[in-house]
Amino acid sequence: MGVRHSASKDYIAGRPLVPGEAPLDKKNSNFSSWKPVTEIDDRDAKCADNWVPRHPDLIRLTGKHPFNSEPPHADVMKEGWLTPVSMHFVRNHGAVPRLEWGSHRITITGLVERPMEITMDDIAKLPAVTVPCLLTCCGNRRKEVNMVKNSQGFSWGPGAVSVNNWTGARLSDVLKLVGVKSQAQGAKYVHFCGPKGELPKGVDGSYGTALTLGHALDPSMDVLIAYKQNGQFLHPDHGFPCRMLIPGWIGGRSVKWLSHLHVSDKDSQNWYHFHDNKVLPPHVDAESAAKQGWWKDPSFILKELNINSTISSPGHDERILMDQNRRYTMKGYAYSGGGRKIVRVEVSFNGGETWSHPAKIIVTETPNQAGKHWTWVHWELPVDTSQFFTATEVVCRAWDESQNTQPAVLTWTLLGQGNNSMFRLRLHKEVDPQGRLCIRFQQPAPILPGPLGNVGWREQEAGSAVPSAPAAVAAAAPGLDSTKKYVTKAMLEQHVEEASVWFAYKGKVYDGTKFLDDHPGGADSILMAGGEDATEDFDAVHSDSAKKQLEQFYIAELAPEGVPVPANLLYGGVDAAVVVMPGTAAAPLPAIDVDAPFLNPKKQKAAELKEKIKISHDVTLFRFGLEHDEQLLGLPTGKHMLIRKKVTNAEGDEEVVMRAYTPTTANETRGHFDLVVKIYKANVHPKFPEGGKFSQILEALEVGDTVEVKGPIGHFHYDRPGHYKNHKLESEVKRINMIAGGTGLTPMYQVMKAILSNPSDLTEIRLLYANQTEADILLRPELEALAKSHPDRVKIHYTVDRPTPGWKYSSGFIDLDMCERALFRYEPGTISVLCGPPPMLKFACHPNLEKMGFEKGVTSIEF
């Protein structure tokens, strides 16, 4: 499990007690409704959440990190109407922000009389309201959808639903505090979002959404800024120190770690407000959604919960003996949205043909003064087991007070959200190990195989699982190790997107999703390997320490092609292996797209050397041809590409060597690209006797030889005049500092040319370029020609280690004085971009830029 927090009595769920908060020990009346966990799970020990204790029984749905989990279906039902906090489902997009009660602020802006920042103490001084409320992810039961056809979301079982007592200030009271303007004055929507930079997309990387001002001000709707759950201040996984609570709506609208409120005349423009939590028509796929504007259509936004119900007893893989008739109590839950009351739950024993069995509804909640019901009901139905003997499918459905009920048939949608089809149990007559006749129950799509090793009937029906293979005794196929889990090639090929990207290395499969934001080469470096065997490319560019680091992302073995894998040995329990049988005809090759760019992030492309031009004694221009004379390279400004070559090393073994390069040719150049490369020869520099490995490989090429090229990669993109993206977060820029060392000039030169060749781009540039000697300065005539033709916008300053007499620029290591003379100081709209040897960046660039107001990784960006 891990190590108990050293000061657990002063902490709750890894956070310090809020001033005045009682310790959560067994003397505390809230202890049973929290069932607190004080130990760090081993699975969290090496990630950013290594301070948050979590219940070990929660089922992790997206690997170790980020933490997305649900309790086992039957377990959460046994807890009763109120869910212990430690067993509450969790939906996190990334690491949990480590926020503090005393320092956290909520910024309130927009159409209010008194824009301000308010503290948590300010909120706690407002009248406190406690609302019992069900939260559920709108992806609840999504695994059933994914078994029909993969959606864009990961699989939830039926356990993404929990009830807590939430305490906080009414949003209406907070809005009155700041003097919210009236609808007549234009105030129509209240926007709310979490911390900036939490997520990869959108203008500021925040998760945000909105509701109407009328809804926010309506006291009957119980909209809160919540800071307590089940009597104690919030668990970090659930939004500490505060979150939105919108009862009767999907959980995705109750934004956690609330940081900003904004009153507007328009609906939220947050990226996630448009691209998440929608139920698009079933014919809409990812391509048509993007091209035809479906994401921006407000008709499909999912706000209120729809009606839903499930069966928890009988459970998955549960058996009932058929030797005699007994009484058995069926159980489950039901809920609806918008405050609507559940009025009945029905059970059918013939697949939904007749509904003659109304269940007993167990109502624990007291509705609010407006008659709103914000939680769930549990239901029970005592039956004779003889009713199971003749049944093949048992179905439940719920009805609410508006006479809504559940659809009989599941509808596939792109995001897989809002699945509320009737919950169906399949029944199987079997003989147990003792030779007794029994009924085995099979739920549609549980997250984990049952105690007998069986998967859900939707998995089985899809033809992707072995129907009845007890995990303890299922024999592995030849070539498989029964103690390990496996991923088939077909499964691997499905994980190529940012939401879930896997790759194989030396026969093992790794989940790179959680490392996308932290990879030094940017997310593209991992995404281009997604769904593939990346062994050659990985070995070509990574050190032994990087290979060691890879171990924490291991998930399974790569199954040998053509070997069937039993369900109990598959990672996730789903066998999506595709076996190509002998004699199967190959699919016809697609026609060549003459307008397609040369670069392909998923495929190595051969480029032939057309010319070698010596620029100086140790600098060469290499011109490589594309597939045809009119073809564009397809490299966005600011990005680079990987070039590799298979060579025979000194030991006589074949190896792949690969490096990242930026061409000096403009994006609009057709038919070829140029690389200007400094050749680091062996036995020239005493500190580097072997010289530059790849530059010497390039120098040895003859005209007509080829290299392999793949890309683009990189986290920086100069998108259009005055705009750039850093890790896909778009920002405006007016002034760019560039610091380059040696061959690190080439990406700077690429960006400079793109800016200065566009008459509408007025961005100013300062370049500080460091080299060993004046003779080492690459592209000096071209640089100074750019500066001469744009004297008001381009300034260039050099520094060299060994200056010659009469040298008019700087000498030595880059220092603060040099930076202040050559570069812009930080102000909004100014960034610094860097490319050069790591020691230069670490010890010279970043420390001095920080003193000038730049923030590493945000406004001081390494290429």
UniProtKB/Swiss-Prot annotation:
The lineage of its organism: Eukaryota, Viridiplantae, Chlorophyta, Ulvophyceae, OUU clade. Induction: By nitrate. Repressed by ammonium, the repression is not removed by the addition of extra nitrate. Urea weakens the effect of nitrate, but does not repress expression itself, implying it possibly reduces nitrate uptake rather than nitrate reduction. Up-regulated by nitrite. Pfam families: Cyt-b5, FAD_binding_6, Mo-co_dimer, NAD_binding_1, Oxidored_molyb. Changing residue 640 to A: Minimal effect in enzyme activity and a minor change in affinity for NADH. Binds 1 FAD (per monomer/chain). Residues 602-719 form the FAD-binding FR-type domain. Its cofactor is FAD; Mo-molybdopterin; heme. InterPro entries: Cbr1-like_FAD-bd_dom, Cyt_B5-like_heme/steroid-bd, Cyt_B5-like_heme/steroid_sf, Cyt_B5_heme-BS, FAD-bd_FR_type, Flavoprot_Pyr_Nucl_cyt_Rdtase, FNR_nucleotide-bd, Ig_E-set. Mo-molybdopterin binds at residue 137. Transmembrane segments: none annotated. Heme binds at residues 519, 542. Belongs to the nitrate reductase family. This is Nitrate reductase [NADH]. Its EC number is 1.7.1.1. One of its GO terms (molecular function) is molybdenum ion binding. Keywords: FAD, Flavoprotein, Heme, Iron, Metal-binding, Molybdenum, Nitrate assimilation, Oxidoreductase. The keyword Flavoprotein applies. CDD domains: cyt_b5_reduct_like. Residues 484-559 form the Cytochrome b5 heme-binding domain. FAD binds at residues 659-662, 676-680, 688, 693-695, 746. One of its GO terms (biological process) is sulfur compound metabolic process.
